[in-house]
A protein has these predicted regions:
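C-terminal motif of bacterial Sec signal peptides marking the signal peptidase cleavage site
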Residues: 22-25
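Low-complexity, Pro/Thr/Ser/Gly/Ala-rich linker/spacer regions in secreted
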Residues: 31-38
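Contiguous beta-strand segments within globular domains
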Residues: 38-48, 54-61, 218-222, 241
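Non-catalytic cap/lid and distal C-terminal segments of serine-dependent acyl enzymes
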Residues: 51, 67-602
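Bacterial signal peptide processing site
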Residues: 27-29
Length: 602
C-alpha cells in the first residue's frame, strides 16, 4: 500500500533560479498564437516539440504549480497537506505543436479549478504521461501507460514521458491572456543494475501475460544466492519470496560498508520525526540513509556468515500498466499474474538455481506485499508453504480501510438521517485525519481517468474489479461522488475478499492452510489496516475442522507498517524483514518438511 508519490532526483533552488532566468521566455511561445479567446478565464496551452516526437501521442497531459522551489513540481503531488497543485486532461492523437488546454473546467487537485488558484508567482511545469495502445487477448482495446519501463509505474519518472523544465510564472485566474508551455524534454531510459557474486537480475517471458496483453510481457526477478552456492553443487534450496512495491535492486542488502560521507544516524530524532521510515525528507535530515546502509550491510554479513539459513531469496518485479505491482493474483484487468508468477517464473527460478519446490517455498511482505503474501497463500494453498503478512492491504472488505463496501452506500462520507461525516483515508499517530477519502480519490482522478493514475485506490479497482464494457476496470465507487456500486462490491467479495474466501471454502482450504498464516499489524496503522486484521483474527481463532493454527500479533500503538518487532521502531524494523522472516519461514519448513532438510543446511 502506498499513498506517497515517490520523487525523482530533485532539482535544487540554484538550478531552478537559473532555469527561470534562462527560460522565462518559455512562459509564452514566441510568437504566441493569436488569442481567439478574449474574455475567457485563464487558459494554459501545453504542447510538445516535434524534436521529442514526430508522431501524434495519446496520454494524460498534466500541469503542475508549486510554491516550493526545492523539488520539481512534478515530484510534489501527494496525499499530504503539503501537496502542490496539479491539473490533468486526457488527449488522443495529440500532434506535435498542437496544444492541450487546461482551463477552468479541467479538474485539479487540491484546488478543483484554475479559477480557485490565488494570483501569484509559481513554479510551473508540464508533463505528458504517454500511453500505449494494447489490443488485449480478451478482445478489449485500451490505452494505458506501459508497465515495463523500469521505474515502477511512476509518471514523474517514466522513461519516454515528456516534460518541460520548471519555470517561474505569474498566474492570475482573472487574466484572459493565454499561457503556453512547450514540453521539450524526455525522461531518459533507466540503466540496468549490474549483477554481483550474490545478486542476479533477469527477466522471463510470460506466455500467459503475453497472450493477455497482446505483446511480449516479461516478469523481472532479483535473486540473491546463498553463501556457498557454487561450492555446494549438490545442494538444493528453499525459496523465500519477498513481495512488495517495485524495486530496481534488492533493498536492505549491501555488499560494501556504509558511505562514510553520509550524515550520522540521529536515532532519537528518527524515532521522534521519522518513526516509520517513510516520512521523506525528514528521514534524510536525520541520517536515515546511513541507517539503511548500515542495516543492509549487517544483513549481508549475516547472510554470508555462519548459521544463517541457506536459501534462495527472490524479489519479483511485476509492474503493470495500472501500478508498480500486480498484487500477484489473476485479474480481469491486469491479466493472469498469479498464474504467471506461480507457474512460469518460480518454476524457472527453481529449475535453474536448484530450488526444492512447493514444500520449501514461502512468502512474506508488508502493506501491498502483506496482502500479496496472504493472497497467494490463499489462492494457491498447495504451491506455497508459509505466509507472513505484515500490515496487509484490506484482507476483509467489511473494513476496506474506513469503508464497509457491503453495507455502506458511500465511500466518501458516513451517512445519517440529517448529516454526513467525511471519512478519513489516513490518520497520524494521534488519530488525526491527514487526508479524506474524497481528497485522495480526487488526486487520483486528476492524475488519470479509467483507473490510470498509478495510485492506490485505482490499483485496487484494477485488481479486484470486473472489466467494464469499455475495457477498463468497473468502479467500486464513483470517483466524484463516492457512491458505491453493490454489484461490483459483490464481485470483489466473491473473488478477492480473502477472509470471506477462507470462511466460504474452509472445508477444502483449511487442511491446506493450517499452520501457514502469520499476520502482524499495528493497532494505530495510518491507513486503518488493523481493522480488517481484527476481522481475520475473529475467523482464524474460531476456525474448526481443522483449526487454523495461525498467529496474529499487534503493535500496541504502532503505525504503518508494523511487522511484529516489539523491540524496535518501525523505522528500524522495516529494514530487517529479510533476516527476520527468512529465519521464521526456515523454521516452519523444517517443522513441516517432506523432503530434503540436509543439503542446504551447511
Amino acid at each position: 500500500m502506498s499513498f506517497i508519490t515517490r520523487r525523482a532526483p530533485s532539482v535544487r533552488l540554484a538550478s531552478l533560479l537559473a532555469l527561470a532566468i534562462a527560460q522565462l521566455s518559455c512562459s509564452r511561445t514566441a510568437p504566441p498564437p493569436a488569442d481567439t479567446h478574449a474574455g475567457v478565464p485563464l487558459r494554459v496551452g501545453i504542447s510538445f516539440a516535434a524534436s521529442q516526437s514526430s508522431k501524434p501521442l495519446d496520454g494524460r497531459v498534466m500541469l503542475f504549480l508549486s510554491t516550493d522551489s526545492t523539488h520539481e513540481p512534478r515530484e510534489q503531488i501527494s496525499d499530504a497537506v503539503t501537496s502542490q497543485q496539479v491539473f490533468g486532461v486526457d488527449v488522443d492523437g495529440l500532434a506535435p505543436g498542437v496544444e492541450a488546454v487546461v482551463s477552468d473546467t479541467v479538474l485539479g487537485y487540491p484546488e478543483r479549478s484554475t479559477a480557485d488558484i490565488k494570483a501569484g508567482d509559481y513554479w510551473v511545469q508540464g508533463l505528458f504521461h504517454v500511453y500505449e495502445t494494447f489490443h488485449r487477448g480478451d478482445g478489449k482495446t485500451v490505452k494505458l501507460p506501459a508497465g515495463d519501463r523500469g521505474e515502477g509505474q511512476q509518471y514523474a519518472e517514466a522513461p519516454g514521458n515528456l516534460f518541460s523544465k520548471p519555470v517561474r510564472m505569474h498566474i492570475d485566474p482573472s487574466s484572459t491572456a493565454p499561457l503556453h508551455l512547450v514540453l521539450d524534454q524526455t525522461i531518459p531510459p533507466i540503466p540496468g543494475v549490474p549483477d554481483t557474486k550474490y545478486v542476479k537480475h533477469f527477466k522471463v517471458l510470460s506466455e500467459r501475460l503475453t497472450k493477455f496483453w497482446g505483446r511480449p510481457v516479461y516478469l523481472g526477478a532479483i535473486l540473491v544466492l546463498p553463501e556457498g552456492f557454487d561450492t555446494h553443487p549438490d545442494a538444493h534450496y528453499p525459496l523465500a519470496i519477498y513481495h512488495g512495491h517495485f524495486q530496481p535492486d534488492v533493498s536492505d542488502f549491501r555488499e560494501t560498508p556504509p558511505d562514510p560521507k553520509l550524515k550520522p544516524v540521529m536515532m532519537d530524532s528518527i524515532i521522534a520525526q521519522c518513526p516509520n521510515g517513510h516520512e521523506g525528507d525528514l528521514c534524510t535530515k536525520f541520517g536515515y540513509e546511513r541507517l539503511e546502509q548500515e542495516k543492509g550491510y549487517e544483513f549481508y554479513k549475516e547472510w554470508t556468515g555462519p548459521g544463517f539459513p541457506r536459501v534462495l531469496l527472490l524479489i519479483i518485479q511485476h509492474p503493470t500498466p495500472y501500478y508498480d505491482d500486480s498484487y500477484a493474483v489473476n485479474s480481469e484487468n491486469n491479466g493472469p499474474y498469479g498464474d504467471a508468477i506461480t507457474y512460469e517464473l518460480i518454476p524457472y527460478v527453481e529449475s535453474h538455481y536448484r530450488g526444492l519446490g512447493a514444500r520449501a517455498r514461502g512468502v512474506y511482505g508488508g502493506s501491498t506485499g502483506g496482502w500479496e503474501a496472504l493472497g497467494v497463500q490463499v489462492k494457491y494453498p498447495e504451491d506455497y508453504n508459509g505466509a507472513v503478512a505484515n500490515c496487509p492491504d484490506p484482507i476483509d472488505f467489511r473494513a476496506f480501510t474506513t469503508v464497509n463496501i457491503y453495507r455502506d452506500g458511500n465511500a466518501f462520507v458516513s451517512e445519517g438521517p440529517w448529516r454526513t461525516t467525511p471519512r478519513p483515508a489516513e490518520r497520524d499517530y494521534f488519530g488525526r485525519t491527514r487526508v479524506t477519502m474524497e481528497q485522495s480519490n480526487q488526486k487520483e482522478l486528476v492524475l488519470g481517468t479509467h483507473s490510470r493514475s498509478g495510485g492506490q485506490w485505482d490499483i485496487w479497482e484494477a485488481v479486484f474489479s470486473p472489466v467494464g464494457a469499455d475495457g477498463y476496470p468497473k468502479r467500486i465507487f464513483d470517483k466524484r461522488t463516492g457512491v458505491i456500486d453493490p454489484t461490483v462490491a459483490a464481485y470483489w467479495r466473491d473473488n478477492y475478499d480473502l477472509v470471506h474466501i477462507m470462511q466460504r471454502d474452509w472445508a477444502t482450504l483449511g487442511p491446506k492452510l493450517r499452520g501457514k498464516i502469520a499476520l502482524n499489524v499495528g493497532r494505530s496503522d495510518n491507513f486503518f489496516l488493523n481493522d480488517a486484521v481484527y476481522l481475520a483474527e475473529d475467523f482464524l481463532k474460531g476456525a474448526k475442522n481443522p483449526p487454523a493454527d495461525a498467529t496474529v500479533d499487534y503493535g500496541a500503538r504502532d503505525e504503518h507498517c508494523w511487522s511484529g518487532d516489539h523491540a524496535n521502531p518501525n523505522a528500524v524494523s522495516r529494514l530487517t524483514y529479510h533476516p527476520r522472516f527468512i529465519k521464521q519461514l526456515a523454521a516452519h519448513w523444517l517443522k513441516t518438511a517432506k523432503g530434503d532438510t540436509t543439503s542446504w543446511r551447511y
